[in-house]
């Protein structure tokens, strides 16, 4: 039996060596697979992080762009409010000019106009009583306007209302006001 025991022992010893060899190979293969999977996971992580970083930068850039645009729009709105305020002050100043200045303006403006004998002069309401007896070489209407003056020629109205005059020059005035107030 000892021969049989030797054979069995030898077979067991060979099986044990083979088992160790197989386990060794399996462990090495396992380590390679784990290493490969870790590398793949790291690459995927890097890809995801780069994509997330890129998306975050895109979101940040879009948000920053919106903030800049909103800020610019607010600045433009504020500038427009200032310009509108200046235009209103111009209208108010013209409307509230002294009687003497109004009379000079009126005389000067009328001298440049080709007036007919049927034309009617419509004066500014707050200046009417003071100027109704003046001679402007044109008939005086009983009607009044809020500011400036008008000439009535039949059904035609030549409007020299200060508000209308300023409004008709608004584009040019806005440019000049902006240049003066907001030059860099």
From Swiss-Prot:
It comes from the Bacteria. One of its GO terms (cellular component) is proton-transporting two-sector ATPase complex, catalytic domain. GO terms for molecular function: ATP binding; proton-transporting ATP synthase activity, rotational mechanism; proton-transporting ATPase activity, rotational mechanism. GO terms for biological process: proton motive force-driven plasma membrane ATP synthesis. InterPro entries: ATP_synth_B-like_membr_sf, ATPase_V1_Esu. HAMAP family: ATP_synth_E_arch (MF_00311). Produces ATP from ADP in the presence of a proton gradient across the membrane. Belongs to the V-ATPase E subunit family. This is V-type proton ATPase subunit E. It comes from Finegoldia magna (strain ATCC 29328 / DSM 20472 / WAL 2508) (Peptostreptococcus magnus).
